[in-house]
Amino acid sequence: MKTSIAIVDYGMGNLRSVAQALKKAEPAADVAIVDTPAAIRAADRVVLPGQGAMPDCMRCLGESGLQEAVVEASRTKPLLGVCVGEQMLFDWSAEGDTKGLGLLPGKVVRFELDGRLQDDGSRFKVPQMGWNRVRQSRAHALWDGVPDDAYFYFVHSYYVMPDDPAHTVGETAYGAPFTSAVARDNIFATQFHPEKSAEVGLRLYRNFVHWKP
């Protein structure tokens, strides 16, 4: 029986890119972009994407009528958050003083890099845009076959700060180390975009399809 994956369509996020990457990573999976609570509840696995500003993402999720179904899914089935979808899982964001879903304890803060210089003498830019390494700070099934310190693609000005360090499974350096991947129980989430991260991103998506938390 095919594994069904629901990509939550609440009006924010690069849904088609995520869907195409998941289908390429695991052609046997049944991948669908969904916009009803019933479709989220019926799926075996759920992906919460997000891009842009967290206040807009939280508002759109609330107005979509899908928020309760996403919270339910976080308790009962594998859930993957991507980019702002990761940030939304936390309690609060400094971006617009925004309340998150509260599924993971912690907050979201902005890079404070004014005047800081990189090794080549250029200034750090916010947002961080481009490839950067992810150090696997804790073993996890979604890292299977993904080399430690592999490059993933980032586009963001804010990052998560989990209250519990044990929830951090990936770290990246940009001015200073920050949490770039988190996990707890059946939840896994990344600040980077696996769908924009070539083969290592596809491997992570394939691992998600087969993950049995």
Swiss-Prot record:
GO terms of molecular function: glutaminase activity; imidazoleglycerol-phosphate synthase activity; lyase activity
Catalytic activity: 5-[(5-phospho-1-deoxy-D-ribulos-1-ylimino)methylamino]-1-(5-phospho-beta-D-ribosyl)imidazole-4-carboxamide + L-glutamine = D-erythro-1-(imidazol-4-yl)glycerol 3-phosphate + 5-amino-1-(5-phospho-beta-D-ribosyl)imidazole-4-carboxamide + L-glutamate + H(+); L-glutamine + H2O = L-glutamate + NH4(+)
Domain Glutamine amidotransferase type-1, residue spans: 4-213
This protein's record includes keyword Amino-acid biosynthesis: yes
Keyword Lyase attributed: yes
EC numbers on record: 4.3.2.10, 3.5.1.2
Example of a GO biological process term: L-histidine biosynthetic process
Subcellular location per the Swiss-Prot or TrEMBL entry: Cytoplasm
Superkingdom of this protein's organism: Bacteria
Keywords, alphabetical: Amino-acid biosynthesis, Cytoplasm, Glutamine amidotransferase, Histidine biosynthesis, Hydrolase, Lyase
Gene3D superfamilies: 3.40.50.880
Listed GO CC annotations: cytoplasm
Chief location: cytoplasm
Active-site residues (renumbered): 83, 193, 195
Pathway: Amino-acid biosynthesis; L-histidine biosynthesis; L-histidine from 5-phospho-alpha-D-ribose 1-diphosphate: step 5/9
NCBIfam families hit by this protein: IMP_synth_hisH
Quaternary structure, from the entry: Heterodimer of HisH and HisF.
Xref: HAMAP family: HisH (MF_00278)
Stated role: IGPS catalyzes the conversion of PRFAR and glutamine to IGP, AICAR and glutamate. The HisH subunit catalyzes the hydrolysis of glutamine to glutamate and ammonia as part of the synthesis of IGP and AICAR. The resulting ammonia molecule is channeled to the active site of HisF.
Designated name of the protein: Imidazole glycerol phosphate synthase subunit HisH
